[in-house]
């Protein structure tokens, strides 16, 4: 074949193009990584999540697409468990190759998606607003907020700026708990969940750590709680919710004696109490799917209802254990949420 014949052979030229072009037969197009940024390096979740990202094997899990590229330390000086840990976790991430930046805005310039991992729920609203404004999908670690008004303000901000977000405790997606949401053919009549329930004075009592057990309770029961009553003492907490269909769900918070996580579920033809915590990997898998454009694994409205359950329990405990309606609690908090959001938006506009 002469040089002129080789150049002029359409079939040959086409075969060479197919053999070498990206995405050609035999060569799948490379899936670009999702550049992730973390806001808040004062919790063990940060280094645990980062380790799962690093160890994920391409082709086996969507987590392998996540690449932690930047982080903003944040931190809260008035919470010792935040202030005392932030330097260590920041160093650990920096040493692993993560760029540490000095502002949320600097982080947003470098990433495709965000994890708000700040330990302090009071900081989440201010941190989430610029993330929503930048159009980045966002996972907000527990607790969503310190109280219901802030949680509602997060949702209002997301609606205003069309932000995509979800929040969850890792307990929700542990397989022996998540199965109750996956298999909707089993009739659940009630559930009893428990978890450690340490207190933090800047948060509603059940928001700080009781959120884990309440999230497990809601995974089994689903949304639709109407009233909550709470009994409280130094060593324990018991909150009883009545759902709109008459079912009853119970959360027991443990502060004294042996502590652990658990869930008993009472069904029409079964009683099961074999739920157990199985680590962060199931949650991180859900985060990866969501940040990659997948469906939202927990409806925002359900997360807001969980915060309303917590606030109603707070009110009930202060008033001697009277029943407190979630819809009334939500209505009062909404007024405060609108005020708080406007304050934050005004601050942002002046910067």
For the regions a language model picked out, list residue spans one by one.
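Short helix/strand-capping hinge loops at secondary-structure junctions
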Residues: 135-137, 142-143
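C-terminal helix-rich "cap/oligomerization" subdomain common to oxidoreductases
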Residues: 28-29, 114-115, 292-351
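Bacterial N-terminal signal peptides
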Residues: 9-23
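N-terminal glycine-/serine-/threonine-rich beta1-alpha1-beta2 phosphate-ribose binding loop
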Residues: 3, 25-134, 156, 160, ...
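Rossmann-like dinucleotide-binding domain that binds NAD(P)(H)
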Residues: 191-258, 301-308
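N-terminal export leaders
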Residues: 1-11
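Hydrophobic residues in well-ordered beta-strands that form the structural core
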Residues: 102, 140, 165-167
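A contiguous active-site-proximal alpha/beta segment in oxidoreductase catalytic domains
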Residues: 144-203
């Amino acid at each position: 074949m002469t040089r002129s014949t080789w150049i002029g052979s359409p079939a040959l030229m086409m075969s060479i193009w197919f053999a070498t072009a990206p995405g050609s037969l035999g060569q799948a197009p490379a899936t670009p990584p999702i550049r992730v940024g973390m806001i808040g390096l004062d919790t063990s979740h940060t280094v645990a999540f980062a380790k799962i990202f690093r160890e994920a094997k391409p082709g086996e899990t969507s987590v392998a697409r996540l690449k932690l590229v930047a982080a903003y330390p944040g931190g809260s000086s008035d919470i010792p468990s935040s202030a005392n840990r932030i330097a260590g976790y920041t160093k650990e991430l920096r040493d692993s190759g993560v760029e540490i930046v000095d502002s949320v805005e600097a982080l947003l310039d470098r990433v495709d998606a965000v994890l708000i991992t700040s330990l302090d729920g009071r900081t989440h609203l201010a941190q989430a607003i610029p993330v929503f404004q930048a159009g980045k999908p966002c996972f907000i670690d527990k607790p969503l907020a310190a109280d219901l008004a802030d949680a509602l303000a997060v949702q209002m901000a997301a609606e205003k700026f069309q932000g995509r977000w979800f929040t969850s405790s890792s307990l929700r997606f542990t397989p022996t708990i998540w199965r109750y949401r996956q298999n909707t053919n089993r009739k659940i009549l009630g559930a009893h969940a428990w978890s450690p329930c340490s207190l933090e004075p800047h948060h509603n009592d059940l928001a700080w750590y009781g959120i884990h057990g309440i999230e497990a309770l809601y995974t089994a029961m689903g949304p639709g709680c109407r009233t909550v009553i709470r009994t409280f003492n130094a060593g324990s907490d018991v909150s009883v919710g009545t759902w709109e269909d008459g079912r009853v769900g119970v959360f027991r918070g443990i502060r004294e004696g042996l502590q652990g996580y658990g869930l008993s579920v009472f069904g029409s033809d079964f009683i099961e109490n074999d739920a157990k915590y199985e680590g962060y990997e199931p949650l991180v898998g859900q985060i990866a799917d969501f940040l990659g454009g997948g469906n939202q694994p927990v409806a925002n409205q359900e997360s807001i209802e969980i915060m309303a359950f917590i606030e109603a329990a707070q009110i009930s405990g202060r008033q001697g254990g009277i029943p407190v309606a979630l819809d009334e609690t939500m209505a009062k908090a909404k007024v405060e949420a609108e005020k708080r959001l406007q304050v934050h938006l005004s601050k942002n506009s002046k910067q």
